[in-house]
């Protein structure tokens, strides 16, 4: 059954003559009227290295679409660089920007009645924001990312952005060494080179099914990334005609991003030790899709999914470019499939099922295509380079070692349960999140006295002033979605703990969140948060916090009676109850509006209206 183009409302008939005049002024040719209008939802900005090359990408995708007879029009969303926004009040704006991005995409597509869209994303909040919008709009959509940055290299040792932060805070590292690390940590355009939030989300998009194989792992500088852009352009044209000419709803986001797809994506996330932020984002995307996917699902998956991959920051041996050489995300999905841990009947945007994609793109498959083998041979250029798709280095061989290689089989997994876990207890009744892939197993059982701070800034001062010693549990409260507001990332506190060589001797727990670059015993997303009257707000200095990762528990060792007594005392503060009494932070109207509607992290920090 043929479906009328959405753009028909603004391009057809005598009454739309004025609108057509405006479209002509936008460059639309007469022969393009009554053809699909495909939006290029870009996120180019010169503030973010992961997005600095996307202007050329957008123009290239536009030209590829228009070669096939459609009209393509580009617009940009905002994009915040979490690394640059880190360590000051700019981080308060990062998570809220996810909703602004989703809203802006919805506004532009609905206002101009675009028929389909290609989403060109890359970094932390941009991919989830665009995914949230795609669920709301439910029009033909293809995602393609700008690609990851190459790993840095200093004297033969590979490194990334996190190494700069750690060494710069270490008093035993010379100024010259810090300068050299700074100069070499980020050598190219692209999203930072480890399994941080940006790369985690671009990898998960392959499992959700809205992005093509290689989306998350082919480096931004390689020419095969340009082929991926061309493939995305061709696919969106094909899928647009499938939907509007043939009524095929299988190409729509809500037909692809089903419960099975979210379970697959979360299983992948756990297996590869992705950023804890991905949990926040998957919950929010599922919420927009109307899919029943909760923290309980994540907890269940975390108990049966093995850890197959340890990429920086969880280990220093491998980076995203190494995942590509080992067969990319399809390689990990294939190993999960062999142990029946994912649903391979799930559909993908390219018309394949997950099973069919594995057969064609798994480098260990007997049916693997030549295209796939070439795709995963794409190597870094190993030089300073800010130009997208400008080098053609290839690996001589692929990494098919599933015993000791970058991607392991379930038989040779790093651990039987995976790289992410959900903990619950009397200070996290609705759950909290920990990236177990980045923790030394010797501290899976940990207890110690609480050192409580009511802001990230005060925690950083305390750590740098030597107020934290081995055995302590750093507790940072009032940094959740409401309490911040904005749920800051705690990368600097964790980096400072590492720089003082306390990474294996301390824990950090918070109702805030962590950068994808965080490792160590760092537990975030504590829900309900302090500002939502959560028990985490009742913890005081020197209370004993007990953490048991194998049992998935986190508790303050206080009786229910003591907690009830403290709650009563807190409520006696009236309107000031469950707010930080000593913190001086200016909160503008924009963030106050965000705080008034946002849920706790266990719901994905979504708006509750």
UniProtKB/Swiss-Prot annotation:
User: What Pfam families does this protein's entry cite?
Assistant: ILV_EDD_C (PF24877), ILVD_EDD_N (PF00920)
- Gene Ontology CC, one term: cytosol
- Spell out the Gene3D superfamilies in the cross-references: IlvD/EDD C-terminal domain-like
- Per the annotation, how and in what number is the cofactor bound? Binds 1 [2Fe-2S] cluster per subunit. This cluster acts as a Lewis acid cofactor.
State the UniProt keywords alphabetically. Answer: 2Fe-2S, Amino-acid biosynthesis, Branched-chain amino acid biosynthesis, Iron, Iron-sulfur, Lyase, Magnesium, Metal-binding
Q: Which residues form the active site?
A: 515 (proton acceptor)
Q: What does the record give as cofactor? A: [2Fe-2S] cluster; Mg(2+)
A molecular-function term among this protein's GO annotations? dihydroxy-acid dehydratase activity
Residue positions of the PTM N6-carboxylysine? Answer: 125
**Where, by residue number, does Mg(2+) bind?**
82, 124-125, 489
Name the InterPro entries on file. Answer: Dihydro-acid_dehy_C, DihydroxyA_deHydtase, DiOHA_6PGluconate_deHydtase_CS, ILV_EDD_C, ILV_EDD_N, IlvD/EDD_N
The reply on keyword Magnesium is yes
The chemistry this enzyme catalyses reads: (2R)-2,3-dihydroxy-3-methylbutanoate = 3-methyl-2-oxobutanoate + H2O; (2R,3R)-2,3-dihydroxy-3-methylpentanoate = (S)-3-methyl-2-oxopentanoate + H2O
GO biological process entries: isoleucine biosynthetic process; L-valine biosynthetic process
- EC numbers listed for it are 4.2.1.9
Q: In which pathway does it act?
A: Amino-acid biosynthesis; L-isoleucine biosynthesis; L-isoleucine from 2-oxobutanoate: step 3/4; Amino-acid biosynthesis; L-valine biosynthesis; L-valine from pyruvate: step 3/4
What role does it play? Answer: Functions in the biosynthesis of branched-chain amino acids. Catalyzes the dehydration of (2R,3R)-2,3-dihydroxy-3-methylpentanoate (2,3-dihydroxy-3-methylvalerate) into 2-oxo-3-methylpentanoate (2-oxo-3-methylvalerate) and of (2R)-2,3-dihydroxy-3-methylbutanoate (2,3-dihydroxyisovalerate) into 2-oxo-3-methylbutanoate (2-oxoisovalerate), the penultimate precursor to L-isoleucine and L-valine, respectively.
> What is stated as this protein's family in its record?
Belongs to the IlvD/Edd family.
The annotated subunit structure for this chain is: Homodimer.
* NCBIfam families listed in its UniProt record: ilvD, PRK12448.1
- Name-wise, this protein is Dihydroxy-acid dehydratase
Native organism is: Azobacteroides pseudotrichonymphae genomovar. CFP2
